[in-house]
């Protein structure tokens, strides 16, 4: 039985985002040579702003292969640029007009929360490899993460820009590879990428100051591990803890999923229903982060048994937090959640 108490987490205040302060050869804020019309087209399709490193990395890939800039890392690293990069590549213009693509679902993998947007995949369809995370639709992404979509919901932060994410992956591959030809190929890409990133002033560290500043504002890690950052004021209004630990909530979910009958499953849902009542109380007192956490955990657990509850909790939480685009993405995702055929431009 779920305990009857719940509380706000102490010390979960929200402060301003810290800007990166590193010495660079060249300002990283210089704009990539991508036309304003093309930028607007990308942002209009997704209703999101993209960071400058997104465009700089595209120009880097164009230098590697001007004819197929989405694929120059495919042969060497198995990486392919997708989703918003498809717009830069003009792939959306090749789509048959008989069907209208849903950009909320384009390359949205099974475990991708609304805060995340796929930008790179690995080995064709095997993984959401690079995903950028923003805590609110009106903010720029804080980091690039890695998720093995066929394994679980865990997301591992890998630098605060695309160059860092690919560089760190390259370093890992260089340690694993034994073939001399591949080693030289990796080193060649690494040298070019490192030089470009340094010229533009991008950090190649796995965990930067900007990421550490976000970590301080995370109120709960959630099942995917990278945490949630709902607005929390100086009086700690905005979030209160769930009455169950992550481990206990996972056990409750496991019991529900493995129930031998519908009757047993309904009984096993009792703790979840009680927590939903707590969420209602929390929402009444502006602690919207509680419903966001419970909904996200149930979404991340992955079972279709939790889709209905997640569909009640998450869109409401996002709307209360004025993150309406995330509510829309979540509704679309839960209505069309799948593990394959996620390329909206596929024939």
UniProtKB/Swiss-Prot annotation:
GO aspect biological process, one term: DNA repair-dependent chromatin remodeling
Coiled-coil spans in chain: none
Keyword Acetylation: yes
Swiss-Prot/TrEMBL keywords: Acetylation
Modified residues (N6-acetyllysine): 187, 234
GO terms for cellular component: nucleus
Residue positions, PTM N-acetylmethionine: 1
One Pfam family it belongs to: HPF1
UniProt entry tagged with the keyword rRNA-binding: no
InterPro entries: HPF1
GO MF, one example: histone binding
Protein family (similarity comment): Belongs to the HPF1 family.
Name of the featured protein: Putative histone PARylation factor 1-like
Source organism (scientific name): Homo sapiens (Human)
